[in-house]
């Protein structure tokens, strides 16, 4: 009897690994959460049909506050699957859930799947040159987060690329676009005036990673902010110092201005 954290991958129900599918099918109970990420190419019904099980979707409150009451007691006497988009432990929330399972006396296993951290390699930027990542969050009343701006600054000082996740309000069906992310960054630039993110900043947008036809675009903010990248999910990348191969890839594959090749 155990709890299995199973990754569903990035885009549609076919992204789950064979191992993940096999284990999910043998589990007695299957739970899932979709508030930490969006799988744009599928829906709950299609995932249930593939697995052959009814899936109970948990809210953020269920996961963060009631996991010990809803999920862990079942895993004491049954095999239980907990499905998440992407790779299970990329979201720090899920690592904390595994700790809770251990304290509850429940054995747990992790079945990996495609993650945005590997998928960003399709941009041509070298994975080992990425620094700390950050999330651009929607401002709220009396709260305008700016920490992501500081992360970009720190990474640029070291010549490193910055992967920026874009906020998700799944319960409201609200998914931030790369355009919205750029606008928020420009607002922070107006506030801080440190020259970290301007109209002349080179950015890379990756939309619908994991699909057969993802959008990969690179260019200056002044141009990119007006582009239509299609439906979410999007991620935004601010490159650091570019290797010649990275620059050529961005030009030839992502449509960046040729002048970035130096």
UniProtKB/Swiss-Prot annotation:
Protein name: Diphthine synthase
Job of this protein: S-adenosyl-L-methionine-dependent methyltransferase that catalyzes the trimethylation of the amino group of the modified target histidine residue in translation elongation factor 2 (EF-2), to form an intermediate called diphthine. The three successive methylation reactions represent the second step of diphthamide biosynthesis.
SUPFAM superfamilies: Tetrapyrrole methylase (SSF53790)
GO terms, molecular function: diphthine synthase activity
Keyword Methyltransferase found: yes
InterPro entries the UniProt entry points to: 4pyrrol_Mease, 4pyrrol_Methylase_sf, 4pyrrole_Mease_sub1, 4pyrrole_Mease_sub2, Dphthn_synthase
Keywords tagged on the record: Methyltransferase, S-adenosyl-L-methionine, Transferase
Enzyme Commission designation: 2.1.1.98
GO biological process: methylation; protein histidyl modification to diphthamide
Disulfide bond entries: none
Similarity-based family: Belongs to the diphthine synthase family.
Annotated residues for binding of S-adenosyl-L-methionine: 10, 87, 90, 115-116, 166, 209, 234
Pathway(s) per entry: Protein modification; peptidyl-diphthamide biosynthesis
Record's catalysed reaction(s): 2-[(3S)-amino-3-carboxypropyl]-L-histidyl-[translation elongation factor 2] + 3 S-adenosyl-L-methionine = diphthine-[translation elongation factor 2] + 3 S-adenosyl-L-homocysteine + 3 H(+)
Subunit structure: Homodimer.
